[in-house]
Amino acid sequence: MRLVDELGLQSVWGADHLLPFAGPDDGACFETLTSLSAMALVTKRARFGVLVNGVVYREPAILAKASAQVDQMSGGRLEFGIGAGWAEREFRAYGLPFPDVAERFARLEEAIEIIVSLWTRPRTTFEGRYYQLHDAPLVPKPVQSPHPPITIGGSGWRTARLAARFASRLNVVGSPAKAAMAFERLQRCCEEAGRAVEEVELSAHPKVAIATSQARAEELALGQAEALGETFPADGSGWIVGSPPQAIAQLQRYAEVGVSHVVLGLGHPFDAELLRLLATEVLPGLS
């Protein structure tokens, strides 16, 4: 985390999982909100967040309160990410109910309404199908006004509609083609919601393997894919792989389809040299 600050990178993001989302399920997997608290204390400049909090893991009022405290601890550097959740094996392992996708999205909509209300109003009363609050205060409020930026994760119509209503950013995992499709959906949903599409940033989350040579980068990518239990796609879809100049060209393709924010997925184990290449040779070359 300190290296992110030292290199001048804009932000660092974690994932919200109860088990490793690939490989053996007994590997290390750190709790998200606890990790954010540590990030708040060991960084001074970089922003940080979760891509994204799974809505069914925690009651929305508890998530709102914990996130507000992290924003306080960091002096207003929290990026708040939230989504419907998808990793069924984690729910089963921990004895949590795993609703169908329609219910998860309905819960997501209610949860965002609750969280924004708790952050911005003195007290909140909410009577929803899934959540109920009764004259609930939340103190202290987040530092950021009116509240921390909200990122909603997903590429379908339901997430686009929610992003158009509530979010500062819509994040999509995958290729430039997938990002382009998500941007078209976001534009239509913003029009329906009476909101300027410029108010909602489109973010992409490709995996990344960058090295001084193409051969070494491909070697890193294959190793990362194997660790994730995946097959590296023949066309490299959803990956940034190559030398710094090649990485710049691949990232520009995202910009061409409306992406203005990229969260690069680093592999395991952590590679400090890759991070330095990003900071010193890739990001300065992006227009």
Positions of PLM-derived features:
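Active-site-adjacent structural elements that line small-molecule/cofactor binding pockets in enzymes
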Residues: 1-287
